[in-house]
């Protein structure tokens, strides 16, 4: 199976979980593509079935903040098409799940159908998720993901309390 993993590249929990999962999947014969703005800290070996794709963000004078989520979405569309990925697995709701859902919608217009799995890690729900500027996007991304997992039962319960989850 060809799997794209979107994650933060840092030593924080979600980046470590995503990287170790991807490494384990590659050891079992799957082809894994990590997609992020920097190589994940725990990804110290690239092999025949383990790849890293950097998301570069251009600075435009028009924007006060570089449009990372847009660049991430475009990069994901490119990789899904070129590498013929079977699955997208995202770790952390913002910006990874929202970028993957938009990429999925773009790819659908090109005749490419790809499932998105979202793994929730904690602060994406309990901290960022409560912020009114992020909550609708996270809610939408969770509801449009094909499968959703949480790193603990308490996080699953918090997610159900904070968001309007449909059929999950």
At which residue positions do the language-model features occur?
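Alpha-helix capping/helix-boundary segments
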Residues: 40, 95-96, 154-156
């Amino acid at each position: 199976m060809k799997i794209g993993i979107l994650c933060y590249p840092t030593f924080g929990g979600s980046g470590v979980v995503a990287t170790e999962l991807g490494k384990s999947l590659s050891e079992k014969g799957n082809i894994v593509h990590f997609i992020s703005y920097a190589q994940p800290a725990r990804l110290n070996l690239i092999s025949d079935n383990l790849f890293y794709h950097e998301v570069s963000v251009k600075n435009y004078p028009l924007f006060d903040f570089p449009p990372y989520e847009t660049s991430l979405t475009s990069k994901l569309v490119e990789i899904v098409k070129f590498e013929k990925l079977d699955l997208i697995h995202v770790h952390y709701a913002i910006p990874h799940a929202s970028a993957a859902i938009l990429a999925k919608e773009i790819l659908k217009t090109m005749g490419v159908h790809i499932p998105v799995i979202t793994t929730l890690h904690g602060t994406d729900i309990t901290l960022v998720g409560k912020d009114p500027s992020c909550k609708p996007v996270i809610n939408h991304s969770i509801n449009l993901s094909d499968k959703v997992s949480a790193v603990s039962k308490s996080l699953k319960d918090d997610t159900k309390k904070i968001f309007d989850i449909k059929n999950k």
